[in-house]
């Protein structure tokens, strides 16, 4: 067996790991998601999936050709192609991603397709982390930077003046940030984390030299979670009544729209459709797996 000596410096300062995917998102919204992350400083994305529709494969292929996306196929660990079966593969996919990239990523960014960690004061992740560490008064970075979850429910009224596929610009009303460690998303040092799951580093190495986690102040950044409200009519009404408008994302608008427009133009030249493509939808994707008998 060949011995591979890892690079002394990680190739990527920020790399995204997406677990076994479920839920739906159209191809244009996926482009906005990946381009927003790239604008903030992410230089590689690792996605785990069981099967992809032709439209999604084409969109993914565009980003694979650019060298910014790696797709790993991971069928469910049991012959159950429902949402429940899909979730069983999530821990394995994230820990596989962490191990694969332990010496490639300085920071592993754990998010899903309907989430993005957005700075409220800074233009990119590098400047944001520099500010966080300065506030902490230490030079040594921590193992995990944890960002509180904020729901940007798609039930809230959208800003119709924004383009239909620019989800982060259209939906700017959010509920109260969740408590610390309740459904957060994180930046993780993969060389100091022994086990990871979809919110933060679960177990650090016993001799880890760094502080375990930082609860990032919500005035600095939050994890924006775009989804339908599923908490029941009464609670959803309460969320809606107390929702606040956050326009801090609009400072990214010009650059983000340019990036998305350029990417969509490239996809059109490649004859890639911009119609709705089911990325990670359990009923669609795992149905495809059954049909193809992977």
Annotate the PLM regions.
Residues 49-50:
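Acidic ATP/Mg2+-coordinating residue in the GHKL
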Residues 4-17, 21-22, 53-110, 118-119:
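Active-site-proximal specificity loops/subdomain of glycosyltransferases
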Residues 26-35:
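Short, acidic/polar
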Residues 1, 87, 91, 119-294:
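Catalytic-site signature of metal-activated, phosphate-bearing donor transferases
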Residues 9-11, 25, 40, 66, ...:
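Eukaryote-biased feature marking scaffold/signaling PDZ-domain proteins and nuclear chromatin regulators
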Residues 35-44:
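Short, acidic, metal-binding catalytic loop of nucleotide-sugar glycosyltransferases
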């Amino acid at each position: 067996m060949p011995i591979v000596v890892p690079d002394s410096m990680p190739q990527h300062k920020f790399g995204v790991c997406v677990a076994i995917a479920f839920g739906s998102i159209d191809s244009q919204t996926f482009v906005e998601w990946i381009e927003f992350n790239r604008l903030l400083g992410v230089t590689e994305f690792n996605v785990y999936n069981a099967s992809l529709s032709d439209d999604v494969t084409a969109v993914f292929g565009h980003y694979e050709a650019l060298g910014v996306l790696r797709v790993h196929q991971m069928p469910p660990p049991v012959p159950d192609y429902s949402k429940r079966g899909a979730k069983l593969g999530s821990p394995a996919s994230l820990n596989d991603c962490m191990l694969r990239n332990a010496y490639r990523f300085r920071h592993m960014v754990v998010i899903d397709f309907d989430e993005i960690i957005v700075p409220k004061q800074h233009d990119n992740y590098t400047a944001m982390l520099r500010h966080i560490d300065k506030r902490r008064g230490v030079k040594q970075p921590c193992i995990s930077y944890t960002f509180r979850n904020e729901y940007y429910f798609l039930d809230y009224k959208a800003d119709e003046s924004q383009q239909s596929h620019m989800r982060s610009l259209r939906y700017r009303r959010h509920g109260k940030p969740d408590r610390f460690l309740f459904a957060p998303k994180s930046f993780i040092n993969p060389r100091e984390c022994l086990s990871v799951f979809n919110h933060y580093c679960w177990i650090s190495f016993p001799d880890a030299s760094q502080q375990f986690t930082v609860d990032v102040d919500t005035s600095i950044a939050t994890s924006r979670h775009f989804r339908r409200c599923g908490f029941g009519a009464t609670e959803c009404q309460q969320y809606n009544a107390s929702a606040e408008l956050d326009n801090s994302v609009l400072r990214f608008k010009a650059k983000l729209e340019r990036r998305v427009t350029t990417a969509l133009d490239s996809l059109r030249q490649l004859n890639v459709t911009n119609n709705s493509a089911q990325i990670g939808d359990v009923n669609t994707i795992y149905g495809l797996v059954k049909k193809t008998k992977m």
